[in-house]
Curated annotation (Swiss-Prot):
The keyword Ribosomal protein does not apply. It is a multi-pass membrane protein. It is found in: Cell membrane. Keywords: Cell membrane, Membrane, Transmembrane, Transmembrane helix. This is UPF0324 membrane protein Cgl0015/cg0018. GO terms for cellular component: plasma membrane. Belongs to the UPF0324 family. The chain crosses the membrane at residues 15-37, 44-66, 81-103, 105-124, 134-156, 163-185, 205-227, 261-280, 285-307, 320-342. The lineage of its organism: Bacteria, Bacillati, Actinomycetota, Actinomycetes, Mycobacteriales. InterPro entries: UPF0324_pro. The keyword Transmembrane applies.
Length: 345
């Protein structure tokens, strides 16, 4: 009877049931982690849910052996949901806000990203590290943290361990920058505006920039976020350039497909930027987009955190940490020098 019932089930229904059974356990675990991260953020607003989520993933995967049934859903979150989160990230950007920074500061931001990437690649070459690992760290530290790592990973042949290492380093060094930039701003006697621009130009994750800008105070938060979002906008051309380079080199993915000239999620990101900049969206829509972006990226961060085995991180050696320190120092220095030059006199 059961065999006849199964045979009589429409193929689409069978497929849908199979997909649900495959991904539900992992996605349910990610959802619980996102809920916990959101609750922590509600009571401690200075703590990013993205950081909480990745820490939860790291702790959980190193304390217990996760059931194999959760693996497909966790992998889906760390890849597909992350890219969808990047699409909704575009709703945070408004061209007019970025243009209000003025040409000199926009030129500085381009120098921060370009100088950070090329300088980090040079340091990685001197350290004789694998080029794909170097590129992930360079873009993550120079553009927008884990989202940039994911964006670059989507157009290169990076290994999973390299992605996880780059994200872990972004979390570690970006978190250390939260108290450092406000402290250095005070020691150097910088104004809140300059301190905010410095924070936005040097710190890796948007959430980390928000935390540092809030500590600096005096209006630093607003300008810090705008500068940071200007860096985020450069993810699109960088990803497109890297994808084009991969096509020129004849790279194909494991399924035999060549990378697109411009990744689909980058086109979605740009579409959201254009939508936000040209259409007067209701506050409710913007808020919903922000919530979706945070939830999706938090789920992705939890998924990436579940791939961080402390033992494996120890085995990668000291070179990635040296490169991360060098990249952070370089980006921070360019951001400070450029910001000061644009505000002389």
């Amino acid at each position: 009877m059961s065999t006849n019932l199964l045979e009589s089930t429409p193929p689409f229904t069978q497929l849908r049931t199979g997909v649900l059974q495959k991904y539900t356990p992992g996605l349910l675990l990610c959802s619980i982690a996102v809920l916990i991260a959101m609750i922590v953020n509600h009571f401690f607003s200075g703590v990013s849910p993205l950081i909480v989520a990745i820490i939860l993933g790291i702790i959980l995967t190193n304390l217990i052996q996760l059931p194999a049934s959760t693996s497909p859903g966790i992998t889906l979150a760390s890849k597909k949901l992350l890219r969808l989160g990047i699409v909704f990230l575009g709703l945070q950007l408004v061209f007019s806000d970025i243009l209000s920074l003025g040409f000199p500061m926009l030129a500085v931001i381009v120098c921060i990203v370009a100088g950070g990437i090329f300088g980090t690649i040079l340091m990685g070459h001197l350290l004789r590290m694998k080029p794909t690992q170097v590129l992930l760290i360079a873009c993550g530290f120079s553009i927008c943290g884990a989202a940039a790592v994911a964006g670059v990973e989507g157009v290169t042949d990076s290994e999973e361990e390299e992605v996880v290492t780059a994200v872990a380093l972004v979390v570690i060094f970006g978190t250390l920058m939260i108290p450092f930039i406000p402290f250095a701003t005070k020691v150097l006697g910088l104004s809140p505006e300059i301190g905010g621009m410095w924070a936005g130009g040097s710190i890796h994750e948007i959430a980390q920039v928000v935390a540092a800008g809030g500590v600096i105070g005096g209006g630093a938060l607003g300008v810090a976020v705008v500068v940071k979002l200007a860096r985020v906008l450069l993810l699109a051309p960088i990803a497109a350039i890297l994808s084009f380079r991969q096509r020129r080199q004849g790279y194909t993915s494991p399924d035999g497909k060549r990378p697109p000239v411009v990744p689909l999620f980058i086109l979605g990101f740009l579409a959201m930027v254009v939508l936000r900049s040209t259409v007067a969206l209701p506050d409710e829509v913007i808020a919903a987009g922000g919530f979706l972006q945070t939830a999706l990226l938090s789920a992705a961060m939890f998924g990436l955190g579940c791939g961080v085995k402390i033992q494996n991180l120890i085995h990668v050696g000291v070179k990635p940490f040296i490169l991360a320190f060098g990249s952070t120092t370089l980006v921070t220095s360019i951001a400070l020098a450029g910001t000061l030059l644009t505000h002389l006199g």
